[in-house]
Every structure is written in C-alpha cells, then in structure tokens.
Amino acid sequence: MTVAESPNLMVAGIGEMVLSSSTEARLVAYGLGSCIALAVWDPRAKVGGLAHFMLPSGPASGSNPVKFIDTGLDPFLRALESKGAMLSRCAIKAAGAAAMLTVGGGLAIGKRNAEALQAALAQRGLALQASSLGGNAGRTVQLEVSDGRFLIKSLSSVIEL
C-alpha cells in the first residue's frame, strides 16, 4: 500500500474521525501503536468512516470524545448514520492495539483498548467482522470508500481485511 498525498486522502489523527460518501476517498490513520483504528463501511450507501481511538476510557465531558473508546464510539456511529449509513449492514473492522505502552502495574494499553472496543461494540449489538489487533508492531491503515477494502501496513507486510 502506498499512501500518497492527494485531495481524496482524509487523515484521522489521534482522537479524530473522518467520514466520507465520496467513492474517491481514502481514509487513513498513520502510525497506530496501542491506539485502535475502527473502520466502518456501508456497501449500499457507499459511506465510510475511520476513527482513531487512543485510550479505552476518558472523562465524560472532555473536549475530544473520540480520543476515548467509551466516549467516542457513539458520536462516530451517529456521524456515520447522519451520512446515510445503516449500521446493520456495515462492515466493521479494526486494527492496532499493539503492546507498545504499559501503565502503572503493567496494564497493557493495547490489550485494554481491544477489550474495550469489543465490549462497546457488543453493548450496541455490533461486532468486528475482521481485525488485526495486538502484537507488538505499529501499523498504518487505509479504508477505500469505493469498495470497503481495509488495508493494513506494518514494517513486514501489507494485508487486506
């Protein structure tokens, strides 16, 4: 996967989400370590979104809810629905959650992120159709809005989910 700068490239930085209904759009999150990129794509509406979550939980009234899975998932899903996506027909995929950082007593942020995401999706009646979570390597991901391809690039490989 070559991620070249173009007018159709939309980048989700840490704590950000990007959404598009343009079939020319490519949604990208660079340098995922313990963070998680969640890609959601509706094949009928041709709407895609990518959220770049940093931590499993955060303050209930923070200025950047998408930084945290517990406060950011609902705004992300609502934004997709406002663009015409129907969650029941969406492909939901994720990557990241590598073992890059530990906090305090050795609680792995990546593992906690993966667990929090899967639990939050389950609470909403949703599940991942595919994922590349864990390990100890960083990743860059790209969602092609035209066809829903979710590409994951690491130092050693490029895979498609």
Q: What do the PLM-derived regions correspond to, one by one?
A:
Residues M1-L161:
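Active-site microenvironment for binding and transforming phosphate-containing groups
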